[in-house]
Amino acid sequence: MEPWIPQWLPQPSGRPPAPSKDPDRGLWKDRYYQPIPHSWHNGERVHQRQDVGRSPQPQQDPREDLQEPHYAARSGEWRPPVSGVDYYEGGYPSQLYSRWSIEDLYQSYYSPALREEYAYGSYYYHGHPQQLQEERVPRQGSPYIWQEDHRDQKYLNDHQHENQNSPFGTNRETQLQSKSRNPYKDSPASNSGQERPEDLFMESPLTGAQKNKLSLMEESNLLWQHESGLTSSSYELSQYMADASELCDPMTSAVWSPVQAEDISAAGPKEPMKFYVPHMPVSFGPGGQLVCVSPSSPSDGQTALVELHSMEVILNDSEEQEEMRTFSGPLIREDVHKVDIMTFCQQKAAQSHKSETPGSRDSALLWQLLVLLCRQNGSMVGSDIAELLMQDWKKLEKYKRQPPVANLINLTDEDWPVLSSGTRDLLTGEILPSVETPAQILEKFTKLLYYGRKKEALEWAMKNHLWGHALFLASKMDPRTHSRVMSGFTSTLALNDPLQTLFQLMSGRIPQAATCCGDKQWGDWRPHLAVILSNQGGDPELYQRTIVAMGDTLAGKGLVEAAHFCYLMAHVPFGYYTVKTDYLALLGSSHSQEFLKSATTEAIQRTEIFEYCQMLGRPKSFIPSFQVYKLLYASRLADYGLTSQALHYCEPVGTALLSHGESSHPVLLVELIKLAERLKLSDPLVLERRRHRGDRDLEPDWCVHLRGHHRELQQKEAGDIGRPQSAQAVISEARKTPENTFYQDLSGPQGNSEAYGDRSALWPTLEQSGPAQLSPQQPRSYPTGGGSGQMGVPVPLYSVPETHLLGTSGSMAVTGAPGGTAWEEAQQIHLPPVSPETLQHPDGQKAISRPQVPLIPRARSISESSIVSVKEDEEEPPRRQIKIFLKYRPERKPEREGDTKSSGFGWFSWFRSKPTHNASPSGEEDSSDSPDSEEMPRAASLPQPSPSLSLTPSPDPQSLLGASAFSRDTGGDEVRGSVSGVGTAEGPGSGGLSGPEGVSTELCLNAGVLLPPPSVKGSVPLYNPSQVPQLSTVTSLNRPNRLAQRRYPTQS
């Protein structure tokens, strides 16, 4: 018997069990099964019919979904008889039926312990009961809890429709009466589709031959066990393990179940449970706490137990927390004494010396450098660093001279002869020992000089190693000879000799040690760097490039600490982790590896100490790229339960961000505010204030400053996009710094027509500006620093404000949509809007009314500035106009030659004319003075002016020609605003315009074109821009008008 099968009460061996009183249950009669009736929808009891003398009818296998014949036992097969023990004790043979029928046995029975029942997935199905509740012994915690009244009624009532529609409803009893499993359902015979005769229940009375075969079934099962290689004990163990695996696999049971999922009893749970075993949910709190919720049963009235654990206590023995606790951070200049930092660095250096890792010596050197910097308040001197490099240098290495190589001078491998070498015998070829003493060598050198043989004497001195005499003699000769002698002298030194490095550096080239250090054959890199730092002179850039090259070579060899030491000596700034081309991001850690391996705790602490040493000499010398690592270190402190220290780390980061002002990173600022918000209750001062004041929103002062700075950045960003600003403040700021407004990054919203509503406060109205009294003869003055304007570069007076449409009494169709190109160009200029005017083409075509957009201020020369007053720009900013929409007008060639010629010399004739302050009273006289006045329509009277700027066009197209930037109100006669010409405005009741109002407004199209002077009778006009169509209609802000520069040369 398998351990998971329900145990049956043993029956007395002397008598058979009493038959059940239930009429619907099948009875044992001569060890045959009676067919169990099924209830159909009409209430009749239908027995499945099967001919005893013939083969069973084909039935559908529930596992294969195919129609296979239910065949009787073959003649060659042997079935063991059912033993008496199985008959009397169990009531049914234990190994007679399929294992899958056991699953069908308990289909309609569920346990009140729904959690335990559902933990086995879809294993429990509805089935037909085969034993009474009192006839079995239930196990402790078993899901099989039988109910007597549920045995027949539940089966017949709940599954009436299912038995009707099931393809094997007539042979249902063959799948519901078995209690045992077939241990060989996964055997090769079962997998090949061959079913054993005993796998399916024999529903009709069996024949005599079948009785005999059934009696031999037990023997056949033992034979199968022997063939499969399983003993009885291992067979039972394998069955138990297989059954246990199937209990946790709901998909397997669902495949073989003839009962659909919707027919399962509604008492069971409908949704799958997330966990099959009891568990404990945990969560990490912001204050370094671990919150645990113990498992409970709310249905039984148990309340959940919430436990709070401190991460500082849990991780008290961890190495990472110990490393953070011993470091006295954050390192603030006013709170931490440098003696504590020096002690910490010395301990770290001693630990690095004890470890025998490859980079331990270089790591100890970095810690010793930090000690020296902390002692000297961040200052570095070359001789002090050289002493640090050579302090553990026990003895000088004996640098061996390398074998000679072919040089570019003599192209031979011959080396300079040594002192002990003698002359070679011509007969024998042997080298005779030299008998010359140093005195004799010097005497021969002197004799050669007696006779004026300088070259021979130089060669003799070089061969006999009289390098002092040779160098002095060569210095008085030609430079080529001196260079050759120096090369010969340095060639006698070893390549890895520090003297070779120094001499090469003094010769003005990067030493070979800078590109070869780090190899074992080359030797140590420290003496070379020491001799470079101690003898700095000449070209500082050459020395810096040499040290950086040495650092790059060491970094390529994997010596990161040594490379960073060189970078610090070359004053290389710290970079960012994401920029792989930067030299260093954290001191002693390579940023070319993974971030978690790069941003180690030791590297962050080492970099913070270096920043602290710099602040000892310069208080505000923060490392901008290091602030994000401080925030990361504060987060790690909070994770390890050190919340108070983490909150203290946020304060210097916030101080550094506030000191940088607008150059700070907004994302880092937001993350810092979030972390400080979570940790603010770790500050005891804040807790004390909350108790006394009762203010729950109280936070540290530096947090308040951070939030205010964040709001300022947001407001500035909103202002750049389209936030309304005061025009007067913008104009005054632009006048103070005209050279800076040109390089501002101007951006504004495009395509949002609703944003340009009634913003009358954005630009000053005409009442504020008043009628402008222009004096053309007043000399023009430029602000300081306006050299760019004199060179012809247009400098806008207004930097940020965008153009908008003011509310008008009428309506007007704007030619350019807000999302169009013309509107975008107008938005980039950011000049005040003015009223619309009409544009007159040169050929006299029909005037087209177009909305005016702000004018780009043009550049003026000194000659022009001597005549025109600066008040023109200061008092009448709305007067200037630019015609962006003329950009799409095709260019036209001049019709007459004389027009072009006269316009080219118009500026000279303008100088000869002497305009007066008096303007002509009407536009008729003004237009008569111009030779081209026939082509220009006269200005008509304007409507009544309104207090504010208006975009309402006049019904008469002729009245729009030459219109100024003002209109007439219906209730008053006073003219307000500024005239677009250079004349003065008329008084009340004036019906005409003064000055060159009749002149075509295309004069204002280009920023580099002069404004027309006041038209006086008898004066010569400047020129007509309509006659010069080759001029660019729109001048870019980034490029001056070259034609204007050639026509109006500047004077220095």
Swiss-Prot record:
Keywords: Endoplasmic reticulum, ER-Golgi transport, Golgi apparatus, Membrane, Peroxisome biogenesis, Phosphoprotein, Protein transport, Transport. GO terms for biological process: endoplasmic reticulum to Golgi vesicle-mediated transport; Golgi organization; peroxisome organization; protein localization to endoplasmic reticulum exit site; protein transport. Residues 21-32, 41-52, 891-900 have a biased composition (Basic and acidic residues). The keyword Membrane applies. Residues 984-995 have a biased composition (Gly residues). The keyword Transport applies. Residues 1-85, 159-198, 735-794, 836-857, 891-999, 1014-1052 are annotated as: Disordered. It is a peripheral membrane protein. The modification Phosphoserine is found at residues 55, 75, 142, 166, 187, 190, 253, 257, 863, 866, 869. One of its GO terms (cellular component) is endoplasmic reticulum exit site. Its main location: endoplasmic reticulum. Residues 271-718 are annotated as: Central conserved domain (CCD). It is found in: Endoplasmic reticulum membrane; Golgi apparatus membrane. This is Protein transport protein Sec16B. It comes from Bos taurus.
